[in-house]
């Protein structure tokens, strides 16, 4: 009888427990297993109830339910303890009840391993644990976690790009405000169309807290714009240069510049004249002041500028002061002043008129001023009125006023060119060893033209320091540029010379060659093209014909005045021609 009762009690408890588990009547089952009746049960019934008590505890307190309380939900607790998001929680495969309990759940480590806290099922990541399903589960969790991390990285990249776009828009607004401020300041100060007066913008720049400036103030004393350094006394900078500038205004000689006076060196038309041995390396710059009858020349690896008397072909003197190769020279309009720029990142102004003193001796103290503002090699110069514009590999253009001896504008190309509304975003403004960033520059009044290594021509308004137009067509670096009012001539390493109609913004004529164009000049209706390793080609625009100058191979630069042509070659020689 007792055995029958025990069996009935056992079956009743089993049925009751199963029903409770099936319908999740945890409170009712808890009272049975943890109540006083449990203490009176002995024998096999006790063992059975212990089993169900274990099942109950593992079910009620496993995983998500273990950390449930009045302050949080199970999903949040489980996510925090396992470092998984809601999506990954839903994708976790089912586990045995003796797995995934409380702090025994899995978590990722930075070294790529998965560690389980339970001592009963501790295994290695290589699948050598006791349970094959355990290993599969580990791999699945690891896969989900890594995918989650990748998604988070992608989201972070999107947020960074979005923030960058916002900052770029703010930058454009700040630049526009700076330009508007300068325009309003100029109008308030009563500046005319032909003058450039840049007010103090340092307060505006400080308010914006921005590191880059497109136009810097002439009163700015930090390293971004280094003011002109005069030799030998900086304190006399403005007065000395102003005095020389006013005194150097040229009045034409009564005799003028007559080509016939130089027939002895030029020879007959189209024939080679006299050849001068001037330098030891290839000549990189020539400049003529016809009213003085002086030619200047510079060469590679030569820190000096040599001045030549055109009528006698004698060397008048040497200008020393640069600390590295002189890249380019230019006579300042209507003055006896010569501007030079070199790889030492400096721009110098020289008094050429006093190359010889009253006693006929060479004068060594001819450098009037040194502009030390650039941080890299200066490769292009343009002069207009009483100003000089210099272009450098440091990605800036600087506008120097000879009247005051100060830098009145500093234009950062990395910022200014981003404001051009066209396909210039592809522009690579990184200078290379052999190709300068700015290959040519020319200026008329406040209109500046520059040519870059990517073959793009930019038109600038110096009054506001901004690009007002661009010309695209060249497929190689621009090496030479000549601005002639309504027309512009450019030579390029893409083996072409282009004549641009600036009124239409298009190419008027295109000249193609078999070699790279290294220098271009214009004389009346003729275009003189110096080509890499070939004779000089002369194009007659009226007759549309090409002619070659004999014995003009390896020309590296050239300069022309009326029918006088001077060629510099890679041997350091200068040859004269009559066109």
Curated annotation (Swiss-Prot):
It comes from the Eukaryota. CDD domains: WD40. SMART domains: WD40 (SM00320). WD repeats lie at residues 278-320, 321-360, 373-412, 419-472, 473-510, 512-539, 540-578. It is a peripheral membrane protein. Involved in mitochondrial fission. Has a partially redundant function to MDV1 in acting as an adapter protein required to form mitochondrial fission complexes. Formation of these complexes is required to promote constriction and fission of the mitochondrial compartment at a late step in mitochondrial division. Belongs to the WD repeat MDV1/CAF4 family. This is CCR4-associated factor 4 homolog. The lineage of its organism: Eukaryota, Fungi, Dikarya, Ascomycota, Saccharomycotina.
């Amino acid at each position: 009888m007792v055995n029958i009762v025990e069996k009935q009690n056992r079956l009743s408890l089993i049925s009751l427990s199963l029903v409770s588990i099936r319908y999740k009547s945890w409170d009712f089952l808890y009272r049975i297993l943890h109540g006083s009746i449990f203490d009176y049960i002995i024998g096999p019934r006790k063992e059975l109830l212990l089993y169900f008590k274990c099942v109950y505890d593992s079910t009620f307190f496993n995983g998500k339910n273990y950390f449930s309380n009045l302050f949080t939900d199970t999903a949040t607790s489980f996510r925090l303890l396992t470092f998984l998001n809601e999506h990954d929680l839903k994708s976790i495969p089912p586990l045995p009840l003796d797995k995934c309990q409380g702090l025994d759940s899995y978590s990722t480590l930075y070294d790529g391993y998965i560690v389980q806290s339970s001592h009963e099922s501790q295994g290695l990541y290589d699948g050598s644990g006791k349970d094959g399903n355990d290993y599969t589960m580990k791999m699945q969790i690891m896969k989900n976690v890594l995918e989650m991390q990748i998604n988070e990285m992608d989201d972070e990249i999107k947020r960074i790009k979005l923030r960058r776009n916002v900052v770029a828009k703010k930058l454009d607004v700040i630049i526009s405000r700076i330009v508007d401020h300068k325009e309003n300041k100029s109008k308030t100060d009563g500046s005319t169309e032909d003058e450039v007066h840049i007010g103090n913008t340092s307060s505006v720049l400080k308010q914006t807290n921005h590191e880059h400036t497109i136009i810097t103030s002439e009163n700015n004393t930090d390293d971004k714009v280094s003011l002109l350094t005069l030799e030998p006394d900086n304190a006399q900078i403005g007065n000395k240069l102003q005095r020389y500038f006013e005194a150097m205004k040229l009045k034409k000689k009564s005799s003028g510049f007559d080509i016939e006076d130089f027939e002895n060196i030029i020879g007959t038309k189209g024939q080679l004249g006299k050849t001068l041995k001037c330098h030891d390396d290839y000549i990189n710059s020539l400049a003529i002041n016809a009213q003085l009858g002086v030619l200047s020349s510079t060469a590679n690896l030569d820190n000096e500028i040599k001045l030549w008397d055109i009528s006698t072909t004698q060397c008048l003197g040497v200008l020393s002061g640069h600390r590295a190769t002189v890249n380019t020279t230019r006579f300042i309009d209507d003055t006896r002043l010569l501007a030079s720029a070199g790889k030492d990142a400096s721009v110098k102004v020289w008094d050429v008129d006093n190359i010889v003193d009253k006693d006929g001796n060479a004068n060594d103290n001819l450098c009037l001023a040194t502009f030390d503002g650039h941080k890299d090699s200066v490769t292009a110069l343009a002069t207009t009125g009483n100003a000089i514009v210099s272009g450098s590999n440091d990605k800036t253009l600087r506008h120097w006023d000879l009247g005051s001896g100060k830098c009145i504008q500093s234009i950062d190309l990395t910022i200014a060119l981003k404001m051009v509304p066209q396909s210039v975003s592809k522009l690579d403004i990184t200078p290379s060893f052999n190709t300068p960033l700015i290959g040519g520059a020319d200026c008329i009044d406040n209109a500046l033209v520059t040519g870059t290594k990517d073959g793009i021509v930019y038109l600038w308004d110096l009054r506001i320091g901004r690009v007002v137009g661009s010309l695209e067509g060249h497929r190689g670096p621009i090496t030479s540029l000549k601005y002639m009012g309504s027309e512009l001539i450019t030579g390029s390493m893409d083996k072409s010379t282009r004549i641009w109609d600036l009124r239409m913004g298009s190419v008027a004529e295109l000249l193609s060659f078999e070699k790279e164009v290294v220098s271009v000049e214009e004389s009346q209706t003729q275009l003189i093209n110096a080509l890499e390793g070939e004779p000089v080609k002369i194009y007659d625009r009226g007759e549309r014909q090409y002619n070659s100058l004999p014995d003009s191979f390896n020309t590296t630069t050239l300069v022309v005045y009326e029918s006088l042509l001077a060629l510099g070659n890679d041997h350091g020689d200068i040859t004269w021609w009559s066109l």
